[in-house]
């Protein structure tokens, strides 16, 4: 587009009360831009709304109730392996048939991921588990119990 008017310099010319902006108050506060923020969207800024924000007004979409939204709270098998003996001493886990049984759902987690090394035979009780985590646990003689999944 062709520039019709040279932009006024932002520099404070002359260090006077108005700094080149005419009457005192012409360049002060929000009167020069039609109000703070979204003021005037239904009045003097309506054309701007139609052009740049056509979906500003009206209802859009649906908000799910918070109780139906479940977050993924995950822990890695490497962390469980490191914490296993500590969890037994704190009575958050127990030993059964040579394995350390850890119920991650009682600790607030709902998924087990596969990062880290597994050195101890663990029996993990969880709501969901990644393929890699399951492989690592069973490779050292461990066991995985997924809540809601049929046992073979």
UniProtKB/Swiss-Prot annotation:
Q: Which GO BP terms, alphabetically? A: translation
Give UniProt keywords alphabetically: Ribonucleoprotein, Ribosomal protein, RNA-binding, rRNA-binding
What Gene Ontology cellular component terms go with this record?
A: cytosolic large ribosomal subunit
Q: Does the keyword Ribonucleoprotein apply?
A: yes
What's the family?
Belongs to the universal ribosomal protein uL15 family.
User: What HAMAP family is this protein classified in?
Assistant: Ribosomal_uL15
Assembly, in brief, is:
Part of the 50S ribosomal subunit.
Functionally, this protein is described as follows: Binds to the 23S rRNA.
Q: What is this protein called?
A: Large ribosomal subunit protein uL15
